[in-house]
Amino acid sequence: MEEYKLSHLKELEAESIHIIREVAAEFENPVMLYSIGKDSSVMVRLAEKAFYPGKVPFPLMHIDSKWKFKEMIQFRDEYAKKHGWNLIVESNMEAFHAGVGPFTHGSKVHTDLMKTQALLHALDKYKFDAAFGGARRDEEKSRAKERIFSFRDKFHQWDPKNQRPELWDIYNARVHKGESIRVFPISNWTELDIWQYIRLENIPIVPLYYAKERPVINLDGNIIMADDDRLPEKYRDQIEMKMVRFRTLGCWPLTGAVESGAATIEEIVEEMMTTTKSERTTRVIDFDQEGSMEQKKREGYF
């Protein structure tokens, strides 16, 4: 009898599904953080498969900074409605009404108030004790050293020097009241794995990932798409049309595009075979201070 072997992608899928089911079994009130990006889309599909044909026993939550690409918000609402997800959308409306934004306050203040503080408020509001995130270890060095079950204290802070041992597939889910765990079920996936799985499973994604002629400006070395009329007047005469796509998605003034002709999944996979830079190199927030991502994660960022 021929020995049955899982493919590389199916092994990753099995590991992720095991992690998702473990969280559902161990925690009282988990939530899946949904950024609308490719990694979130894969994570959502894994959750759907983990509990099929039943309903996923936890909600999706999107922290809306009010500066996401219009296509992202449209995709979010259509996907949640079509697939019957319980979608929670939270924003820091106080900061938004005060005019906080990336152009007026800079990436650091904007990210802290509109993303980190909004997230922490939402976690406290709904009393979630576990939150799934779509981070991967190959993205960035601070994420590379974080556990799959990442402990957070009662202030939602992460201490990279005080992480719990994590042996094989044994995860420590013990928390006291007020503490929580951030869970990263696709930690061991690479960007190429993500794209190959999207192709394998035919997972719908935001069209911004595909190359297309788009109105962009060059802002401090980043190709920024002019997504709405909040682009400051001083930049508007710099707008030009370029064939670009996005490798990662976030707030449009803080997310750089890459020049590319990859307009299909197959072309994106082929492009990923030869790329040598992480997709996080196009995210402005990762470079707004020394050790930027680790500091943000210590403060409670995704």
Swiss-Prot record:
Keyword Cytoplasm: no
Catalytic activity: sulfate + ATP + H(+) = adenosine 5'-phosphosulfate + diphosphate
Residues in the signal sequence: none
EC number of the protein: 2.7.7.4
GO BP of this protein: hydrogen sulfide biosynthetic process; sulfate assimilation
Organism domain of life: Bacteria
The keyword Transferase is annotated on this UniProt entry: yes
InterPro entries: PAPS_reduct_dom, Rossmann-like_a/b/a_fold, SO4_adenylTrfase_ssu, Sulfate_adenylyltrnsfr_sub2
Pfam families: PAPS_reduct (PF01507)
Classification via CDD domains: Sulfate_adenylyltransferase_2
Pathway terms, separated by semicolons: Sulfur metabolism; hydrogen sulfide biosynthesis; sulfite from sulfate: step 1/3
Gene Ontology molecular functions: ATP binding; sulfate adenylyltransferase (ATP) activity
Enzyme class, spelled out: transferase
Keywords annotated in UniProt: ATP-binding, Nucleotide-binding, Nucleotidyltransferase, Transferase
NCBIfam families: CysD, PRK05253.1, PRK12563.1
Biological role: With CysN forms the ATP sulfurylase (ATPS) that catalyzes the adenylation of sulfate producing adenosine 5'-phosphosulfate (APS) and diphosphate, the first enzymatic step in sulfur assimilation pathway. APS synthesis involves the formation of a high-energy phosphoric-sulfuric acid anhydride bond driven by GTP hydrolysis by CysN coupled to ATP hydrolysis by CysD.
Quaternary structure annotation from Swiss-Prot or TrEMBL: Heterodimer composed of CysD, the smaller subunit, and CysN.
Family listed: Belongs to the PAPS reductase family. CysD subfamily.
Name the record gives this protein: Sulfate adenylyltransferase subunit 2
Gene name of the record: cysD
